[in-house]
Amino acid sequence: MKIELAKSYGFCFGVKRAIKIAENSKNASTIGELIHNSLEIDRLKNNFNVKTLKDISELKNEKKAIIRTHGITKEGLANLKSRDVEIIDATCPFVTKPQQIVEKMSSEGYEIVFFGDINHPEVKGVMSYSSKNVYVILDESELETVKLPSKIAVVSQTTKKIEKFTKIVSYLMQRVKEVRVFNTICNATLENQEAVRELSSRADVMVIIGGKNSSNTKQLYLISKNLCPDSYLIESENELELKWFQNKKLCGISAGASTPEWVIQNVINKLENLTHKDS
């Protein structure tokens, strides 16, 4: 069986930047998980004593607080600034962008339609910057019962699928007088999605590596599953099962934006050992 990596996969700019910040901030604490990958979170804790707090209320005698890649709410930032703690901002610049857009557009009288998961920390953070109504949706059908205003600005969670975003935009363009569209899906997300789409259309088994709570990894898995029914989402090599690869000729591999290279390599090594023993 041949193993092929997607043309674009793994760590994105924002995650690489955040990891470097954390490694240079020994003994700091992150407000929430720095990234959605438990294995990398454990490595940072073990090697750099970077701890994870659930929220700001858990801050006690910590000297340094790191803001996670997904950002923080406007109120949370004000709370942090009121404390005697050094603030280290690891928010991805691509997440800061929709925060700024939402703050500006709402101040100009636009209500916000936000394509995203309402419980995701990135979405909570961006929402908090709006002074107007924010409609957080995953599907355009959720707007059918909403009395839409005459002015709307549309943004997306950075890790969502572009196809769905364009459907939502199209729906609004047909019903709202003035629609301002901001494509805030980041380039790394688009490139990884396009690469997994291409590979899964050829492979007869796909392995997507990443945190189960990672939005961008989940999107890669859904794209892959649609084109290659034998697609599997795993966090580490320990989840691989030999039966997935029996009688398969091409195994495609992709990984989420918060999946470190060492985890990906462990999966490839285990996969090669598994299939070698079986041959």
UniProtKB/Swiss-Prot annotation:
Keywords: 4Fe-4S, Iron, Iron-sulfur, Isoprene biosynthesis, Metal-binding, Oxidoreductase. InterPro entries: LytB/IspH. Coiled coil: none annotated. GO terms for biological process: dimethylallyl diphosphate biosynthetic process; isopentenyl diphosphate biosynthetic process, methylerythritol 4-phosphate pathway; terpenoid biosynthetic process. Isopentenyl diphosphate binds at H36, H70, H120, S214, S215, N216, S258. (2E)-4-hydroxy-3-methylbut-2-enyl diphosphate binds at H36, H70, H120, T158, S214, S215, N216, S258. This is 4-hydroxy-3-methylbut-2-enyl diphosphate reductase. The lineage of its organism: Bacteria, Pseudomonadati, Campylobacterota, Epsilonproteobacteria, Campylobacterales. The gene is ispH.
